[in-house]
Protein backbone atom coordinates (compact mmCIF):
# COMPACT_ATOMS: atom_id res chain seq x y z
CA UNK A 1 0.00 0.00 0.00
CA UNK A 2 1.53 3.28 -1.14
CA UNK A 3 -0.09 6.38 0.30
CA UNK A 4 -0.12 9.28 -2.18
CA UNK A 5 -2.39 11.68 -0.31
CA UNK A 6 -2.09 12.16 3.43
CA UNK A 7 -4.58 9.94 5.24
CA UNK A 8 -6.81 11.22 8.00
CA UNK A 9 -5.78 10.04 11.48
CA UNK A 10 -8.61 7.49 11.46
CA UNK A 11 -7.70 6.15 8.01
CA UNK A 12 -4.03 5.97 9.00
CA UNK A 13 -4.93 3.97 12.10
CA UNK A 14 -6.92 1.59 9.90
CA UNK A 15 -3.87 1.16 7.65
CA UNK A 16 -1.71 0.37 10.68
CA UNK A 17 -4.23 -2.14 12.00
CA UNK A 18 -4.42 -3.82 8.59
CA UNK A 19 -0.81 -4.88 9.10
CA UNK A 20 -2.16 -7.38 11.62
CA UNK A 21 -2.54 -9.77 8.68
CA UNK A 22 1.23 -10.27 8.95
CA UNK A 23 1.44 -10.68 12.72
CA UNK A 24 3.30 -13.76 13.93
CA UNK A 25 0.11 -15.25 15.34
CA UNK A 26 -0.30 -16.52 11.75
CA UNK A 27 3.13 -18.18 11.61
CA UNK A 28 2.97 -22.00 11.34
CA UNK A 29 5.05 -22.36 14.51
CA UNK A 30 2.60 -20.30 16.54
CA UNK A 31 -0.38 -22.04 14.92
CA UNK A 32 1.10 -25.39 15.98
CA UNK A 33 1.51 -24.15 19.56
CA UNK A 34 -2.07 -22.84 19.59
CA UNK A 35 -3.51 -26.06 18.17
CA UNK A 36 -1.69 -28.32 20.62
CA UNK A 37 0.62 -29.74 17.97
CA UNK A 38 3.89 -28.45 19.44
CA UNK A 39 6.24 -30.79 21.26
CA UNK A 40 7.64 -30.08 24.70
CA UNK A 41 10.99 -29.22 23.10
CA UNK A 42 9.33 -26.78 20.73
CA UNK A 43 7.53 -25.02 23.59
CA UNK A 44 10.72 -24.89 25.64
CA UNK A 45 12.71 -23.64 22.67
CA UNK A 46 10.20 -20.86 22.07
CA UNK A 47 10.24 -19.79 25.74
CA UNK A 48 14.05 -19.80 25.90
CA UNK A 49 14.50 -17.85 22.67
CA UNK A 50 11.71 -15.40 23.34
CA UNK A 51 13.37 -14.54 26.65
CA UNK A 52 16.12 -12.79 24.69
CA UNK A 53 13.45 -10.58 23.15
CA UNK A 54 11.89 -9.92 26.56
CA UNK A 55 15.18 -8.81 28.11
CA UNK A 56 15.90 -6.55 25.15
CA UNK A 57 12.61 -4.65 25.42
CA UNK A 58 13.73 -2.45 28.36
CA UNK A 59 16.98 -1.69 26.51
CA UNK A 60 14.93 -0.67 23.47
CA UNK A 61 12.68 1.53 25.57
CA UNK A 62 15.65 3.12 27.33
CA UNK A 63 17.15 3.95 23.93
CA UNK A 64 13.91 5.64 22.89
CA UNK A 65 13.87 7.68 26.08
CA UNK A 66 17.52 8.65 25.66
CA UNK A 67 16.71 10.14 22.25
CA UNK A 68 13.48 11.83 23.36
CA UNK A 69 13.75 15.46 24.55
CA UNK A 70 10.10 15.65 25.62
CA UNK A 71 9.71 15.12 29.37
CA UNK A 72 6.00 14.36 29.20
CA UNK A 73 6.59 11.55 26.72
CA UNK A 74 9.43 10.16 28.82
CA UNK A 75 7.25 10.14 31.93
CA UNK A 76 4.72 7.97 30.11
CA UNK A 77 7.25 5.80 28.30
CA UNK A 78 9.23 4.90 31.40
CA UNK A 79 6.30 2.78 32.59
CA UNK A 80 7.20 0.26 29.90
CA UNK A 81 10.61 -0.24 31.47
CA UNK A 82 9.09 -0.62 34.92
CA UNK A 83 6.58 -3.14 33.54
CA UNK A 84 9.45 -5.38 32.46
CA UNK A 85 12.07 -4.70 35.13
CA UNK A 86 9.68 -4.36 38.08
CA UNK A 87 9.40 -1.49 40.56
CA UNK A 88 8.56 -0.69 44.18
CA UNK A 89 9.38 -4.22 45.26
CA UNK A 90 7.10 -5.82 42.66
CA UNK A 91 8.37 -8.22 40.02
CA UNK A 92 8.11 -7.26 36.37
CA UNK A 93 7.64 -9.06 33.09
CA UNK A 94 11.17 -10.45 32.94
CA UNK A 95 10.71 -12.22 36.26
CA UNK A 96 7.31 -13.44 35.08
CA UNK A 97 8.95 -14.89 31.99
CA UNK A 98 11.53 -16.67 34.12
CA UNK A 99 8.62 -18.28 35.95
CA UNK A 100 7.15 -19.29 32.61
CA UNK A 101 10.48 -20.94 31.85
CA UNK A 102 10.31 -22.88 35.10
CA UNK A 103 6.69 -23.79 34.36
CA UNK A 104 7.70 -25.45 31.08
CA UNK A 105 10.59 -27.34 32.68
CA UNK A 106 13.53 -25.01 32.12
CA UNK A 107 15.81 -23.69 34.83
CA UNK A 108 16.35 -19.99 35.40
CA UNK A 109 19.94 -20.49 34.27
CA UNK A 110 18.72 -22.00 30.99
CA UNK A 111 17.18 -18.62 30.20
CA UNK A 112 19.61 -16.23 31.89
CA UNK A 113 22.65 -17.87 30.28
CA UNK A 114 21.17 -17.27 26.81
CA UNK A 115 22.80 -20.51 25.68
CA UNK A 116 19.66 -21.63 23.86
CA UNK A 117 19.23 -18.39 21.88
CA UNK A 118 19.54 -19.21 18.19
CA UNK A 119 21.66 -16.92 16.00
CA UNK A 120 18.69 -16.05 13.80
CA UNK A 121 16.69 -14.97 16.83
CA UNK A 122 19.59 -12.99 18.25
CA UNK A 123 20.21 -11.19 14.95
CA UNK A 124 16.54 -10.27 14.60
CA UNK A 125 16.26 -8.92 18.14
CA UNK A 126 19.57 -7.07 17.90
CA UNK A 127 18.36 -5.41 14.69
CA UNK A 128 15.35 -4.11 16.59
CA UNK A 129 17.49 -2.71 19.39
CA UNK A 130 19.91 -1.05 16.97
CA UNK A 131 17.01 0.54 15.09
CA UNK A 132 15.68 1.99 18.34
CA UNK A 133 19.09 3.42 19.14
CA UNK A 134 19.62 5.06 15.75
CA UNK A 135 16.17 6.13 14.58
CA UNK A 136 14.47 9.33 15.66
CA UNK A 137 12.55 8.72 18.86
CA UNK A 138 9.13 9.03 17.21
CA UNK A 139 9.90 6.32 14.66
CA UNK A 140 11.49 4.07 17.27
CA UNK A 141 8.51 4.52 19.57
CA UNK A 142 6.02 3.69 16.85
CA UNK A 143 7.92 0.52 15.92
CA UNK A 144 6.31 -0.85 19.09
CA UNK A 145 2.89 -0.73 17.46
CA UNK A 146 2.82 -4.48 16.96
CA UNK A 147 1.21 -4.09 20.41
CA UNK A 148 -1.95 -3.41 18.42
CA UNK A 149 -2.18 -7.15 17.88
CA UNK A 150 -0.62 -8.41 21.12
CA UNK A 151 -3.75 -8.81 23.30
CA UNK A 152 -5.12 -11.34 20.83
CA UNK A 153 -1.99 -13.47 20.92
CA UNK A 154 -1.76 -13.39 24.73
CA UNK A 155 -5.41 -14.37 25.04
CA UNK A 156 -4.98 -17.18 22.53
CA UNK A 157 -2.26 -18.70 24.70
CA UNK A 158 -4.39 -18.42 27.82
CA UNK A 159 -7.29 -20.06 26.00
CA UNK A 160 -5.45 -22.94 24.37
CA UNK A 161 -2.30 -23.83 26.27
CA UNK A 162 -3.88 -25.09 29.53
CA UNK A 163 -6.08 -27.38 27.46
CA UNK A 164 -3.34 -28.75 25.20
CA UNK A 165 -0.34 -28.70 27.54
CA UNK A 166 -1.45 -29.78 31.03
CA UNK A 167 2.21 -30.31 31.95
CA UNK A 168 2.77 -26.53 31.98
CA UNK A 169 2.39 -25.25 35.53
CA UNK A 170 -0.36 -22.70 36.15
CA UNK A 171 1.98 -20.03 37.56
CA UNK A 172 3.64 -19.79 34.17
CA UNK A 173 0.67 -17.96 32.69
CA UNK A 174 0.99 -14.80 34.79
CA UNK A 175 2.99 -12.96 32.13
CA UNK A 176 0.28 -13.35 29.50
CA UNK A 177 -2.44 -12.22 31.90
CA UNK A 178 -0.52 -9.13 32.98
CA UNK A 179 0.20 -8.07 29.42
CA UNK A 180 -3.47 -8.02 28.43
CA UNK A 181 -4.07 -4.72 30.23
CA UNK A 182 -0.55 -3.33 29.82
CA UNK A 183 -0.56 -3.79 26.05
CA UNK A 184 -3.90 -2.02 25.67
CA UNK A 185 -2.55 0.96 27.65
CA UNK A 186 0.63 1.06 25.58
CA UNK A 187 -1.32 0.89 22.32
CA UNK A 188 -3.30 3.99 23.23
CA UNK A 189 -0.13 6.00 23.83
CA UNK A 190 1.69 4.61 20.78
CA UNK A 191 -1.21 5.30 18.44
CA UNK A 192 -1.51 8.86 19.68
CA UNK A 193 2.19 9.43 18.98
CA UNK A 194 1.97 7.87 15.52
CA UNK A 195 -1.07 9.88 14.45
CA UNK A 196 0.43 13.14 15.74
CA UNK A 197 3.84 12.58 14.13
CA UNK A 198 2.77 11.12 10.79
CA UNK A 199 1.20 14.24 9.33
CA UNK A 200 2.26 13.67 5.73
CA UNK A 201 1.97 10.87 3.18
CA UNK A 202 5.75 10.46 3.30
CA UNK A 203 5.79 9.94 7.06
CA UNK A 204 2.77 7.63 6.93
CA UNK A 205 4.40 5.44 4.29
CA UNK A 206 7.61 5.28 6.30
CA UNK A 207 5.76 4.38 9.48
CA UNK A 208 3.95 1.54 7.73
CA UNK A 209 7.33 0.31 6.50
CA UNK A 210 8.73 0.51 10.04
CA UNK A 211 5.79 -1.48 11.37
CA UNK A 212 6.42 -4.08 8.65
CA UNK A 213 10.08 -4.17 9.72
CA UNK A 214 8.97 -5.04 13.26
CA UNK A 215 6.60 -7.70 11.92
CA UNK A 216 9.50 -9.12 9.88
CA UNK A 217 11.55 -9.38 13.08
CA UNK A 218 8.87 -11.35 14.91
CA UNK A 219 8.28 -13.63 11.91
CA UNK A 220 12.00 -14.24 11.39
CA UNK A 221 12.40 -15.29 15.01
CA UNK A 222 9.86 -18.06 14.47
CA UNK A 223 11.50 -19.03 11.17
CA UNK A 224 14.74 -19.66 13.07
CA UNK A 225 12.90 -21.73 15.69
CA UNK A 226 11.15 -23.71 12.97
CA UNK A 227 14.49 -24.68 11.45
CA UNK A 228 15.91 -25.75 14.82
CA UNK A 229 12.96 -27.37 16.58
CA UNK A 230 10.44 -28.39 13.90
CA UNK A 231 12.68 -29.34 10.97
CA UNK A 232 15.56 -30.49 13.21
CA UNK A 233 18.00 -28.29 11.31
CA UNK A 234 19.67 -26.06 13.90
CA UNK A 235 22.73 -24.03 12.89
CA UNK A 236 25.67 -26.19 11.81
CA UNK A 237 23.58 -29.37 11.90
CA UNK A 238 25.49 -30.70 8.89
CA UNK A 239 28.82 -30.60 10.72
CA UNK A 240 28.03 -31.15 14.41
CA UNK A 241 25.26 -32.17 16.77
CA UNK A 242 26.53 -29.63 19.33
CA UNK A 243 25.37 -26.05 19.82
CA UNK A 244 28.34 -24.31 18.20
CA UNK A 245 26.90 -20.81 17.84
CA UNK A 246 27.88 -17.79 19.94
CA UNK A 247 25.95 -17.37 23.18
CA UNK A 248 26.85 -13.90 24.43
CA UNK A 249 25.31 -10.48 23.81
CA UNK A 250 27.82 -8.70 21.57
CA UNK A 251 25.88 -5.52 20.70
Curated annotation (Swiss-Prot):
Catalytic function, reaction form: 6-(2-amino-2-carboxyethyl)-7,8-dioxo-1,2,3,4,7,8-hexahydroquinoline-2,4-dicarboxylate + 3 O2 = pyrroloquinoline quinone + 2 H2O2 + 2 H2O + H(+)
Source organism, top-level taxon: Bacteria
Entry annotated with the keyword Mitochondrion: no
GO annotation terms (biological process): pyrroloquinoline quinone biosynthetic process; sulfur compound metabolic process
Keywords for the protein's UniProt record, in alphabetical order: Oxidoreductase, PQQ biosynthesis
Top EC class of this enzyme: oxidoreductase
A GO molecular function held by the record: pyrroloquinoline-quinone synthase activity
InterPro entries attached to this UniProt entry: Haem_Oase-like_multi-hlx, PqqC, PqqC-like, Thiaminase-2/PQQC
Keyword Oxidoreductase carried by entry: yes
Pathway where it operates: Cofactor biosynthesis; pyrroloquinoline quinone biosynthesis
Gene3D superfamilies for the chain: Heme oxygenase-like (1.20.910.10)
EC nos: 1.3.3.11
Subunit structure, as described in the record: Homodimer.
HAMAP family documented for this protein: PQQ_syn_PqqC
Family: Belongs to the PqqC family.
Biological role: Ring cyclization and eight-electron oxidation of 3a-(2-amino-2-carboxyethyl)-4,5-dioxo-4,5,6,7,8,9-hexahydroquinoline-7,9-dicarboxylic-acid to PQQ.
Name of the molecule in the record: Pyrroloquinoline-quinone synthase
Record organism: Klebsiella pneumoniae
Organism classification: Bacteria, Pseudomonadati, Pseudomonadota, Gammaproteobacteria, Enterobacterales
